[in-house]
Amino acid sequence: MEEKGCKREEVISLLSAYRAEDLHHDHILSSMCTIPHEMAVFVHGMFSATNLGDPGLFPGTTKIEDRLVHSLGELMHHPGAGGYATSGGTESNLQAIRIAKKLKPEIKNPNIVVPASAHFSFDKTCDILGLEMRTVPYGKNYTVDCDKMAEMVDKNTISVSAIAGTTEYGMIDDVERIAKIALENDLFFHVDAAFGGMVIPFLPNPAPFDFEVPGVSSISLDPHKMGMSTIPCGCLLLREPEQFGTLNVDTPYLTVKKECTLAGTRPGADVAGAYAVIKLLGREGFRAVVAGCMENTRRLIEGMEAFGYTRAVDPVMNVATFEAGPVPKGWIVSHTRAGHLRFVVMPHVTRDVIENFLADVAKIN
């Protein structure tokens, strides 16, 4: 830190130069985050000084968090769900598994059973909590093999998980089947819908994946993905709100005396932004956003197949994967662990972006 500060213009110039080094969204085809909605950006500024970690100081912002949780609970077919705004899917998954562990204190060597598609946050969770992670291989279409999942459950298992909108392929595990496994074995069942939670409800005839399925204990979903909020904003929802009490710690010097959240200081700005977008768009607006992304996904697949790129799987949502092949320079495309090209067609990936990409693909084929 320098002894004397700089002029405002110098600071802005410096930061602008760094920002210019960041990649432009019109060439990013691999991210599950997107450009925030302009409403979210505006509202974020309104609430930039708020801290949900001390709710007595910010009762209005706390009410917004409550409304966000209620709105997302309604979307997940359970308006009475308990929940709070997290920093994203990693925190949500960790907290869900913490609860699962707290609910089974008698198990001394606990394990969790997760699909091969599980996000790496489950690895972090098991490392932090000292759990064994049992990974179930894929069945058909890069979804979990439910028969093998049932076989891997034993007396030390505390939870099973499903992924609704897998990170690599955008697929949905058979939540109803896994729920039966959970109920038969008295297990906590967590659905990681960090990506799919704000996509699947807006698809035509969506597969059951949320609290309408008996046996689902918790759901994670991220408004900072397809919800187009500012980053970071996730949400953890519980079927039984009182289970959050297993995580409570005393907070004697705050305006509340107990706290179940992982972070202490929690920004209210992203939460307000997320709620603002939900209020602005409504279900009708989100259906239109998702429909647009799906239409662009189909156009991408059509174009890639015309150049000889074979799709890896028929997508359920706005993720497209293909057998490996050349990618034009300047475009950010990722690869799955199996080596497939992976595209995520977020709201910033417009039809013009798709056509520009396909035009560049044509030049190298």
Curated annotation (Swiss-Prot):
PROSITE patterns, per database record: DDC_GAD_HDC_YDC
Top-level enzyme category: lyase
Enzyme nomenclature, EC number: 4.1.1.11, 4.1.1.25
A molecular-function term among this protein's GO annotations: aspartate 1-decarboxylase activity
Entry keywords, A to Z: Decarboxylase, Lyase, Pyridoxal phosphate
S-S bridge residues: none
Cofactor(s) of this protein: pyridoxal 5'-phosphate
Entry-linked SUPFAM superfamilies: PLP-dependent transferases
Keyword Lipid metabolism: no
Catalytic reaction annotation: L-tyrosine + H(+) = tyramine + CO2; L-aspartate + H(+) = beta-alanine + CO2
GO biological process: carboxylic acid metabolic process; coenzyme A biosynthetic process; methanofuran biosynthetic process
Pathway: Cofactor biosynthesis; methanofuran biosynthesis; Cofactor biosynthesis; coenzyme A biosynthesis
Modification sites for N6-(pyridoxal phosphate)lysine: K225
Keyword Ion transport tagged: no
Function: Catalyzes the decarboxylation of L-tyrosine to produce tyramine for methanofuran biosynthesis. Can also catalyze the decarboxylation of L-aspartate to produce beta-alanine for coenzyme A (CoA) biosynthesis.
PANTHER family: PTHR42735, SPHINGOSINE-1-PHOSPHATE LYASE 1
Family in the record: Belongs to the group II decarboxylase family. MfnA subfamily.
Protein name (record): Probable L-tyrosine/L-aspartate decarboxylase
Organism this protein belongs to: Methanocorpusculum labreanum (strain ATCC 43576 / DSM 4855 / Z)
Gene that this polypeptide is encoded by: mfnA
